[in-house]
């Protein structure tokens, strides 16, 4: 519907009949409400065009004068503007993103200019870009001083001048009819950045444009800044497809606006400048940090300033102060929200009362938290109550005034934002693990009846002599439920007290050269049952040791137990590390994530000779490897419970890890090589001398063309020379395939066509082919796949030749590298499935699990290697139960039951859909035969979700404390 304005055009008419501000939104609920709050005292008309998938129905309730249009199909900028110009009834309008703030006074001045100058079609002032952070707002140069009056008599003349500066006119106040004419000619189907550029060109082409020497607005930086490099584009190169689109757009614009030949170059140049418009870091103008004590910002100006711009006056800075209050009270930017997650995590931790009498008083903790971010209403309320109880009248008055100001803003409590973050979810999940008062009493009584349960020696390394970090660790231990512990601190600082090894808290003076010996000495003299290493600043969870004390009573065979942990990331947020059951290959591949903070039986630690001085930066990893060398894998276990919150390890190569891994592999008889494909991880080349014959069994043939692609990929991309390919053929396609193979050169002689009757299922065919196979190792390869890397057979053999390994599987990908299968997880989405589906080829995955070799419960027949001897010993595929589907899962589980490992390797990549064959009968048979394994995959942590994409946080649930007491 094309609405023509019947409103008076003179300045005497009400403002809402003369001018409409159009806000464009897409999944920006908080920013939209914040913007509407900014404009609430203005009397102009407002229209919201919201392309979010879900309607924001509350907008018109909260802001009754606002017209709201839900337009989920209007994704692009131009689509939204077209919706707007159809509905706006006023003669003038301006367009702004929901993240932007236009200044009402500037809009009024621009409107008055256009009303007084009929020959002009658009008017605006100068704007800044902003980037909101947790504690500050940074402002960046956006518009530069240049021509302010594009008043050429012709479009060509205006374009020639406009090409010099190219200010963005996206938010300019314009005549509604000007935009209607322009959008009648503008091409569609381009991305939003090109549409915005076309919008600006249309205004300059249609009429004169004026820039007033006034502050006009501030725009969120990421909405107006072009990324440094498009995704997938290397630095210094151009996205050729984007360049082609830009050229196509410039041609269409020139045609649409009837530009003369001489003006076409101007159109091209302007479009290029507008599209490439960016806000470089060097354009930062000022930094405005919120002072929580004063309730206002404190500004710091950069050394380079642009005093020719109209921003340097108190009135504008007062406006910025009001906007900054809104930005902090209703945060929405990605950078800001991520930083606030870390800040509010710290606030959450500081707001907890401490049991430790030596801890920092609660009022001081809360006051410190308030200074970091004053807009957390829960924190303000708690601090106010504490200060009222303390009787600090001056502080109370300040807090009461601030609380009223926050309430008057009427935004959602920012504390709820934290609840939705990963850190907030993890803390809430962790709190649910704590026992109730009655459960605590029952568990304590249970342990007391068993000599108090196991005792834990907590070995804390304090090589930086950081008393604040030490205090955090002490507080966490005291706040826990476990009381069967002794703490030994190995510090390079001055000893705070004289203690003895019998003390609950014992300090030992160490230096860089002797701390390992001192640790070993303490361990040998300790009367604790279990030892655990930690660093100053690590915080034990309230219930981790408490649960371990109960569980370990029932596990006398355990020598060492891994638990889970939360890690503080470099940005201050939390990430979970939910480890699998003992996973030898994952331990070897990524020890920084797998080898830390194990509970080790003290007598085992002593028997192994303690920690090694030779590998100081990999002490725990080296100890575990020596334990494997001495006792195998039987005494190693895992408990699905977070033990502590610690600093995330640095993502870097560790020479000590590599050295002890090489030492360990040599003990196991391998002359191996260890490299780091990804920093912080290890890739082991076992360097086997054997070159066994490999039989590749192609199965699942449906389409002859797909089969030919599969065979070509094997014949052309396989570097390994000792292999054969077995292909089933029926009478119908045998001669066709043989003729095709005859034309493929001498490599095709490796392919053997085996006659097989129609309708033979996958399981039966693989069983039959295995009997015809001449190779010592079998590879199943589905016929619609293509191998990618030339060393794929060598990489499979690198694992399969290990005596402890039974089955090896590959990484399945789309043609663009996206993951389709990365090992199989039992019970995922109520069946058997893969995690990481759809992840890009550059993804590292949860705990690096997309880039390192690891053990898993099963891999699929899409690409699977097993020795022929083991395949026969396992009686092949169970064709009675799993002939059509899930025979691969059943085979892997039977091989695992026999004591062999299944290894998934990312170093073999195969193009294939990754869809696992499944039938109701096969699923039922698998559930009946392997119910225990399906109930909990031992290589998938029980705290992780079994629904969805995998490796996400599972539901919040309590520990069944009473059930543990058996």
Where are these regions (language model features)?
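A recurrent flexible, glycine/aromatic-enriched loop bordering the glycosyltransferase active site
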Residues: 153-174, 575-603, 771, 827-869
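Short, acidic, metal-binding catalytic loop of nucleotide-sugar glycosyltransferases
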Residues: 36-45, 474-484, 712-722
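Non-catalytic membrane-proximal stalk/linker segments that position and tether the catalytic domains
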Residues: 1-16, 281-456, 461-468, 472-473, ...
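A short, conserved alpha-helix in the catalytic core of glycosyltransferases
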Residues: 178-182, 189-212, 604, 614-635, ...
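Conserved donor NDP-sugar-binding/catalytic core segment of glycosyltransferases
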Residues: 107-140, 543-574, 633, 786-830
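Short aromatic/hydrophobic "clamp" motif used to bind/position activated sugar donors
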Residues: 93, 531, 778
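Active-site donor/metal-binding and catalytic loop motifs
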Residues: 128-136, 170, 185, 205-235, ...
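Glycine-rich, basic loop-to-helix element that forms the pyrophosphate-binding segment
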Residues: 71-88, 510-526, 756-773
């Amino acid at each position: 519907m094309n609405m023509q304005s019947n409103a008076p055009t003179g300045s005497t008419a009400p403002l809402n009949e003369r001018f409409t501000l159009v806000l464009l939104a897409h999944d920006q609920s908080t920013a939209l409400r914040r913007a509407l709050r900014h404009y609430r005292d203005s009397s102009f008309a407002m229209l919201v065009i919201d392309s979010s998938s879900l309607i924001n129905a509350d907008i018109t309730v909260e802001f009754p004068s606002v017209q709201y249009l839900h337009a989920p199909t209007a994704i692009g900028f131009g689509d939204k503007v077209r919706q707007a110009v159809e509905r706006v009834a006023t003669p003038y309008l301006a367009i702004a993103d929901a993240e932007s703030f236009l200044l009402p006074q500037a809009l009024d001045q621009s409107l008055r200019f256009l009303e007084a100058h009929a020959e002009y079609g658009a008017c605006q002032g100068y704007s800044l870009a902003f980037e909101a952070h947790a504690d500050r707002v940074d402002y960046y140069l956006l518009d530069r001083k240049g021509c302010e009056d594009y008043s050429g008599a012709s479009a060509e003349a205006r374009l020639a001048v406009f090409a010099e500066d190219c200010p963005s006119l996206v938010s300019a106040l314009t005549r509604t009819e000007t935009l209607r004419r322009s959008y009648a000619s503008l091409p569609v189907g381009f991305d939003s950045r090109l549409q915005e550029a076309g919008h600006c060109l249309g205004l300059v082409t249609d009429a004169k444009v004026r820039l007033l020497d006034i502050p006009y607005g501030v725009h969120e930086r990421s909405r107006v800044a072009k990324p440094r490099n498009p995704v997938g584009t290397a630095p210094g190169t151009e996205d050729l497809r984007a360049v082609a689109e830009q050229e196509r757009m410039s041609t269409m614009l020139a045609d649409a606006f009837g530009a003369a030949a001489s003006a076409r170059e101007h159109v091209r140049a302007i479009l290029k400048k507008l599209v490439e418009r960016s806000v470089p870091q060097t354009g930062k103008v000022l930094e405005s940090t919120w002072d929580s004590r004063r309730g206002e910002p404190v500004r710091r100006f950069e050394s380079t300033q642009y005093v020719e711009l109209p921003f340097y006056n108190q009135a504008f800075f007062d406006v910025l102060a009001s906007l900054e209050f809104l930005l902090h009270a209703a945060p929405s930017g990605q950078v800001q929200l991520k930083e606030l997650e870390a800040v509010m995590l710290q606030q959450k931790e500081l707001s907890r009362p401490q049991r430790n009498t030596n801890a920092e008083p609660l009022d001081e903790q809360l006051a410190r938290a308030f200074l970091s971010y004053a807009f957390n209403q829960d924190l303000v309320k708690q601090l106010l109550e504490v200060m009222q109880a303390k009787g600090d009248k001056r502080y109370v008055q300040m807090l009461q005034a601030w609380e009223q100001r926050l309430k008057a803003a009427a935004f959602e409590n920012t504390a709820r934002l934290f609840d939705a973050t990963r850190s907030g979810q993890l803390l809430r999940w962790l709190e649910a693990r704590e026992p109730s008062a009655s459960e605590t009493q029952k568990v304590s009584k249970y342990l007391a009846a068993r000599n108090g349960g196991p005792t834990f020696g907590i070995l804390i390394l304090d090589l930086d002599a950081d008393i604040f970090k030490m205090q955090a660790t002490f507080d966490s231990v005291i706040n826990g439920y476990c009381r069967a512990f002794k703490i030994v601190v190995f510090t390079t600082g001055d000893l705070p007290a004289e203690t003895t090894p019998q003390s609950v808290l014992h300090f030992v003076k160490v230096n860089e050269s002797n701390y390992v010996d001192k640790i070993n000495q303490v361990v040998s003299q300790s009367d604790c049952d279990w030892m655990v290493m930690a660093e100053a600043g690590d915080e034990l969870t309230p219930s981790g040791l408490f649960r371990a004390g109960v569980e370990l009573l029932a596990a006398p065979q355990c020598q060492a137990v891994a638990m889970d942990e939360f890690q503080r990331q470099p940005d201050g947020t939390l990430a979970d590390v939910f480890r699998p059951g003992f996973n030898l290959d994952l331990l070897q591949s990524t020890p920084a994530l797998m080898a830390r903070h194990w509970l080790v039986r003290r007598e085992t630690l002593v028997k192994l000779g303690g920690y090694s001085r030779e590998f100081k930066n990999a002490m725990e990893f080296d100890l575990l490897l020596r334990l494997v060398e001495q006792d195998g894998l039987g005494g190693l276990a895992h408990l699905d419970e977070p033990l502590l919150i610690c600093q995330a390890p640095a993502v870097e190569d560790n020479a000590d890890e590599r050295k002890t891994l090489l030492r360990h592999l040599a003990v196991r008889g391998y002359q191996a090589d260890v490299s780091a494909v990804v920093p912080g991880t290890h890739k082991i080349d076992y360097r086997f001398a054997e070159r066994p014959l490999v039989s590749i069994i192609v199965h699942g043939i449906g389409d002859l063309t797909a089969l030919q692609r599969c065979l070509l990929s094997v014949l052309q991309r396989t570097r390994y020379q000792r292999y054969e390919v077995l292909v089933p053929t029926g009478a119908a396609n045998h001669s066709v395939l043989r003729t095709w193979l005859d034309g493929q050169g001498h490599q095709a002689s490796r392919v053997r066509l085996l006659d097989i009757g129609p309708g033979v299922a996958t399981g039966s065919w693989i069983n039959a082919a295995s009997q015809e196979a001449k190779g010592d190792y079998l590879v199943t390869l589905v016929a619609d796949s293509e191998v990618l890397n030339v060393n794929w057979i060598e990489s499979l053999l690198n694992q399969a030749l290990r005596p402890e390994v039974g089955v090896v599987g590959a990484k399945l990908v789309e043609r663009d590298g996206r993951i389709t299968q990365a090992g199989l997880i039992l019970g995922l989405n109520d069946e058997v499935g893969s995690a990481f589906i759809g992840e890009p080829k550059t993804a590292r995955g949860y705990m690096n699990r997309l880039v390192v070799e690891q053990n898993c419960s099963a891999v699929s027949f899409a690409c699977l290697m097993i020795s022929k001897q083991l395949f026969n010993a396992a009686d092949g595929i169970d064709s009675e139960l799993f002939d059509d589907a899930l025979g691969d899962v059943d085979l892997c589980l039977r091989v695992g039951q026999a004591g062999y490992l299944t290894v998934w390797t990312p170093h073999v990549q195969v193009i294939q859909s990754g869809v696992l064959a499944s039938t109701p009968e096969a699923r039922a048979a698998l559930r009946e035969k392997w119910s225990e394994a399906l109930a909990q995959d031992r290589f998938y942590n029980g705290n992780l979700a079994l629904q969805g994409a995998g490796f996400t946080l599972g539901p919040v649930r309590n520990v069944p404390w009473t059930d543990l007491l058996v």
